[in-house]
C-alpha cells in the first residue's frame, strides 16, 4: 500500500490495528498497514498487537500520531 492509499483509506479518528515495533522513552512506535506511527507516552513492549486511534496525520512527512483505542 502506498502512503496515498493509506491517506485515502483513513482519517483522523479511525481505529486501526498495529504491532509495536519499538519502545522509546517518549512513547511506542506502531506499524500499521506498512507505515509506522508514534503513540506518545505509551510504553507497550515490542511485538504487542494494539488497537489505536489516529490522532493526527502529517501527509508531507508521512507520519501519524496514535493513542490507545
For each of these PLM feature ranges, what is it?
Residues 1-69:
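Single-stranded RNA-binding regions, centering on S1/OB-family and related RNA-binding modules
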Amino acid at each position: 500500500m502506498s502512503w496515498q492509499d493509506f491517506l485515502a483509506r483513513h482519517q483522523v479518528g479511525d481505529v486501526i490495528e498495529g504491532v509495536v515495533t519499538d519502545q522509546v522513552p517518549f512513547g511506542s512506535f506502531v506499524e500499521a498497514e506498512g507505515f509506522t506511527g508514534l503513540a506518545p507516552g505509551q510504553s507497550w513492549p515490542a511485538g504487542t498487537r494494539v488497537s489505536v486511534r489516529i490522532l493526527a496525520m502529517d501527509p508531507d512527512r508521512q507520519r501519524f500520531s496514535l493513542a490507545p483505542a
